[in-house]
């Protein structure tokens, strides 16, 4: 009887040993795979487990988001061919990314085309048709978006709320909107972020090339901006997060735009702007202001009356040079009493326009 029991146990052990390892091997095999999708729903629903996701000539249905915010950590996302979107009046976004250690890139010749002219009516987000935001780079951590070619977004292009995100060699071309009613087509809108590094961007649009509304440790370098509203901080104030700190905007050009360098804070709001540096910025064809810093914005427009609730401190303007149009203002500074301080102002040489007679409370060292 004892020998039978031993034989039974031995047989059981052999069966266990011979059984395949459970999910670990199959999971690892699946994780190492490249998944190619030709439909947005496939990518959204089946991306889990793919180490690389290839989006092959995706046509996103009207009113839907190409949602890649729930992919596995470490995933690489590749755009192939032309990505397009069906038409519907809605708020969007058309694309959403999220996750940790994510890489987003495209193959040669690919383009992400918003076909924004279907929505453009000259009003942007201020009225008319409801227009979808284009891309949300939200909840990304330790990630990179590189080499994307984006064309004709309905309104704002890339909204960033992230930690340690690199955006490298991004092209946003909304130049078709110049004559077709493009409006509020911001390039990069940054808020509630820590560590955002935008390098080598090319932006052609009808609004801010970059707008930093809140966040810290932000860099914009080697950028080329044209047609829009320039390199902007703000408007700061009136949001959940109203702190902008440690920003460097450097080695960039702004051409044929309303403004070159701009900082704006909200009338009667609270917050702070500190440790901001603009350096080696080249301007040409500026139509409104070469440099404009004002603490008077309300409902998206200047009031002419500055307030002190969002101080601008430790600001460096170094090597901002170039030309503005003859009816533009070279430099305009409108600060509240004592709310602009510790500024460094060097190598500013802007010519061709008018000198403002309306500057107020210009801090020591700056000139207006």
Curated annotation (Swiss-Prot):
Catalytic reaction list: (1,4-alpha-D-galacturonosyl)n+m + H2O = (1,4-alpha-D-galacturonosyl)n + (1,4-alpha-D-galacturonosyl)m
GO CC entries: extracellular region
Residue stretch(es) of the prosequence: 19-31
Any GO MF annotation of the entry: polygalacturonase activity
Class in the EC hierarchy, top level: hydrolase
One Pfam family named in its UniProt record: Glyco_hydro_28
Location (main, coarse): secreted
Record's keyword terms, sorted: Cell wall biogenesis/degradation, Disulfide bond, Glycoprotein, Glycosidase, Hydrolase, Repeat, Secreted, Signal, Zymogen
Glycosylation positions in this chain: 246
Localisation per UniProt entry: Secreted
InterPro entries reported for this sequence: Glyco_hydro_28, Glycosyl_hydrlase_28, PbH1, Pectin_lyas_fold, Pectin_lyase_fold/virulence
GO BP annotations, alphabetical order: cell wall organization; pectin catabolic process
Active site: 207 (proton donor), 229
Disulfide bond annotation, renumbered to this chain: 35-50, 209-225, 335-340, 359-368
EC numbers for this chain: 3.2.1.15
PbH1 repeats: 140-162, 167-192, 193-214, 215-235, 244-265, 273-295, 307-352
N-terminal signal peptide: 1-18
Role noted for this protein: Involved in maceration and soft-rotting of plant tissue. Hydrolyzes the 1,4-alpha glycosidic bonds of de-esterified pectate in the smooth region of the plant cell wall.
Family listed: Belongs to the glycosyl hydrolase 28 family.
Name assigned to this protein: Probable endopolygalacturonase A
Organism of provenance: Neosartorya fischeri (strain ATCC 1020 / DSM 3700 / CBS 544.65 / FGSC A1164 / JCM 1740 / NRRL 181 / WB 181)
């Amino acid at each position: 009887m004892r020998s039978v029991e031993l034989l039974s146990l031995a047989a059981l052990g052999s069966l266990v040993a011979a059984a395949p390892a459970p999910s670990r091997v199959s999971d690892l095999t699946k994780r190492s795979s490249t998944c190619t999708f030709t439909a947005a729903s496939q990518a959204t629903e089946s991306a889990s487990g793919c180490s690389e996701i290839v989006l092959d000539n995706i046509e996103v249905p009207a009113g839907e988001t190409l949602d890649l915010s729930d992919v596995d950590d470490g995933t690489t996302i590749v755009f192939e061919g032309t990505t397009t979107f069906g038409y519907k009046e809605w708020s969007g976004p058309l694309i959403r990314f999220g996750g940790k250690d994510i890489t987003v890139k495209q193959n040669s010749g690919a383009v992400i085309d918003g076909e924004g002219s279907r929505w453009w009516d000259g009003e942007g987000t201020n009225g008319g048709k409801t227009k979808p935001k284009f891309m949300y780079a939200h909840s990304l951590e330790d990630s990179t978006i590189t080499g994307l070619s984006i064309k004709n977004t309905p309104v704002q292009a890339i909204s960033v709320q992230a930690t340690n995100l690199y955006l490298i060699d991004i092209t946003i071309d909304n130049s078709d909107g110049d004559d077709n009613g493009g409006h509020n087509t911001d390039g990069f809108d940054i808020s509630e972020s820590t560590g955002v590094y935008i390098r080598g961007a090319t932006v052609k649009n009808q609004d801010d090339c970059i707008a930093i509304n809140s966040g810290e440790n932000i860099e914009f370098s080697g950028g080329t901006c044209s047609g829009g509203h320039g390199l902007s901080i703000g408007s700061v104030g009136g949001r959940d997060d109203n702190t902008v700190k440690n920003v460097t905007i450097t080695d960039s050009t702004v051409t044929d735009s309303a403004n070159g360098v701009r900082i704006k804070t909200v009338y009667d709001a609270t917050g702070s702007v500190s440790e901001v540096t603009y350096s080696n910025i080249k301007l040409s064809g500026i139509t409104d202001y070469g440099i404009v810093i004002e603490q008077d914005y309300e409902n998206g427009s200047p009031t002419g009356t500055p307030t002190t609730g969002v101080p601008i401190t430790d600001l460096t303007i170094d090597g901002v040079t170039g030309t503005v149009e003859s009816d533009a203002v070279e430099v305009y500074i409108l600060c509240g009493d004592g709310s602009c301080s510790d500024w460094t102002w060097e190598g500013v040489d802007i010519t061709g326009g008018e000198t403002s007679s309306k500057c107020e409370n210009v801090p020591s060292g700056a000139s207006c």
